[in-house]
Amino acid sequence: MEKDPLTIIEQAEDHFIERIAENMHAFGMPSTVGRVLGIIYMNRKPMTLTELSEATGMSKTRMSQVVREMLDANIAEKVFEKGVRKDLYEVEQDYYQTFITLFSATWSKVVSKNKMMHKKLNRELLSVLDEELTPEAEEKVNELLKELKEWLDYYNWLSRLIEFFESEDIFKYVPKP
């Protein structure tokens, strides 16, 4: 017995949605965010919270939280459609742009946190050097300061890498097919 063509289509869409959810999870996003992104993406047009709630089986309250997470991560946006009174949400239809957005957001947070930690540790270690230290302790502080410099160099490099993606210069070296 052959499967109904509509069933095959629905199953294929479900597979796409699940793959998108798994990909989002790789960026540290909850799978529910990935599922909703996939649902809107596969819908190919903006959706309301009610439509999303029905598509996922989640409450409108939970759906509102998920959409807020997506808005905060810049992977969804609220759009206006003439004649529609409810808020509509859409997602980027370009996989490459979605990747750049997620990559940049994820790594920008990491860079920011680590640069703040660098400042704090650097300040603390420099103040320790003003104290009377044993030669071993002074050597250890200097090793840590050197490590901090390498750490800062790494996070500055990551900042440049993020800019490389955001400027889309990446496509000059790794073109889209």
Swiss-Prot record:
PANTHER family: HTH-TYPE TRANSCRIPTIONAL REGULATOR MJ1563-RELATED. Residues 49-73 bind DNA. InterPro entries: HTH-GbsR_regulator (IPR052362), HTH_MarR-typ (IPR000835), MJ1563 (IPR026282), WH-like_DNA-bd_sf (IPR036388), WH_DNA-bd_sf (IPR036390). Belongs to the GbsR family. It comes from the Bacteria. Disulfide bonds: none annotated. GO terms for molecular function: DNA binding; DNA-binding transcription factor activity. The keyword Transcription applies. The gene is yvaV. This is Putative HTH-type transcriptional regulator YvaV.
